[in-house]
UniProtKB/Swiss-Prot annotation:
GO cellular component: extracellular region; host cell cytoplasm
Domain of life of the organism encoding this protein: Eukaryota
Keyword Disulfide bond appears in the UniProt entry: yes
GO biological process entries: defense response to fungus; killing of cells of another organism
Signal peptide: 1-18
The protein's role, per its UniProt record: Antifungal protein; part of the gene cluster that mediates the biosynthesis of oxopyrrolidines, polyketide-amino acid hybrid compounds with feature structures of tetramic acid. Acts as an inhibitor of growth of various molds and yeasts.
Disulphide bridges, residue numbers: C41-C69, C48-C76, C61-C87
Keywords in alphabetical order: Antimicrobial, Disulfide bond, Fungicide, Host cytoplasm, Secreted, Signal
Propeptide: 19-33
Transmembrane regions listed in the UniProt entry: none
Pfam families associated with the record: Antifungal_prot
GN (gene name): opdH
Family named by the database record: Belongs to the antifungal protein pafB family.
The name this protein goes by in its record: Antifungal protein opdH
């Protein structure tokens, strides 16, 4: 009787160790969300300017017609996690 109850407890512990709580993926998702920066487009230089840590950072937008800045001071977004800039984001 004791052997069967101990074996059930042992199996439950092994299952908990084998399937850890998905905290790492939640932290990774949070990091991805925190790595997005909003900024403004500069039509003359075709670059997105955003502020990171109190400093202005310039990232060039794409050269294709659907990747360029729409207008001066248009909202743009830089995703530092994926290293992508979106100069066509809707306001």
């Amino acid at each position: 009787m004791q052997f069967s109850s101990l074996s059930l407890v042992f199996l439950a512990v092994i299952g908990a160790i084998a399937n850890p709580i998905a905290v790492d993926s939640e932290l990774e998702n949070r990091d991805v969300q925190l790595s997005k920066y909003g900024g403004e487009c500069n039509l003359k230089t075709n670059a997105c300017r955003y502020t990171k840590g109190g400093k202005s950072v310039f990232v060039p937008c794409g050269t294709a017609a659907n990747k360029r800045c729409k207008s001066d001071r248009h909202h743009c977004e830089y995703d530092e996690h994926h290293k992508r800039v979106d100069c066509q984001t809707p306001v």
